[in-house]
Amino acid sequence: MTLSIVLLILLSSFARAEWRLAGETGVVYNSNLSNSDRSADVRDDWAWNSDISAGNALQLTRDLRLNLGADLRGELWDRFGAFNTIGPGASAGLRYRFDLGRQAPWFLLEDRFGYDRFQDTAQSGYDNVLNFQAGIALSDRIALEGGYAFESFVAPNDFYDRQLHRANASIVFDVTSSLQVSAGYIYREGDVISYAVPPRPDIARFSIEREDEDVFGQPLRTAYKLLGRTHALSFSAAYQLTKYASVQLGYEYAVTTHDPLQYENHVVEANIAVAY
């Protein structure tokens, strides 16, 4: 009898499942892909990136939903092909909304596990991100969102192992029914890799590890792995073209420090997204 009840609940959940297919493609520009602090060492580049995903949302209760998904993402860089990446992944998350109203507060707890295959195979590895996000609408047009994430990347070459903590907060404004803009602050703390033409005894004395690399061509650079703290400001806009398609623009300015090292990144993105 108990087994029959469980099966009925599962069948009912699948009946209320919401399948979703989504994809986006576009370009991204990074003003300091090498994460360098000296202008002579800085290397910028742009990439074409794409992401496709399929997901299933199961309404477990009136307010609780289980999200299951799979995705495939990739980046193709113009000048520095060692950073070309393709990576499949799978995710599972629980989303809870405290009421049925549009302005009801909500939270999402999600975990994604994937594998990132770099053209420079030494950098390839397994990526796991545990993410908590929450939001609340202040009015019909304004909402606040924020959260925390922990990322762990494990590679066969442990020089490329990374752990990262990230906290974010943003305000979202619906300008019109088709246009949405947002502004946010992001704090990141964890392992970063900075590239520099040697000798750099000022960095070497506090770096966790270092390796000689040719990913940026000549002259050869040394990759320094260190603990970095990043403060970033982000701005984005999304315009709904049709029921299923939108255009998205984004900009992030970030400053990463580990005294005496400090470097800046300007990242600009433009994407077309579709969802069904």
Show where each model-derived region lies.
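Residue-level signature of outer-membrane beta-barrel architecture
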Residues: 54-58, 94-98, 134-136, 140, ...
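Surface-exposed strand-loop-strand hairpins of Gram-negative outer-membrane beta-barrel proteins
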Residues: 29-51, 80
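Detector for outer-membrane/organellar transmembrane beta-barrel domains
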Residues: 127-218
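Extracellular loop and loop/strand-boundary signature of outer-membrane beta-barrel proteins
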Residues: 37-42, 76-82, 115-120, 129-131, ...
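Repeated loop/turn-to-beta-strand initiation elements of outer-membrane beta-barrel proteins
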Residues: 62-66, 99-107, 138-146, 177-183, ...
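Outer-membrane beta-barrel "beta-signal"
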Residues: 239, 264-276
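Residues that define the transmembrane beta-barrel architecture of outer-membrane proteins
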Residues: 44-50, 82-90, 124-130, 152, ...
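Transmembrane beta-strands of outer-membrane beta-barrel pores
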Residues: 25-33, 58, 72-78, 98, ...
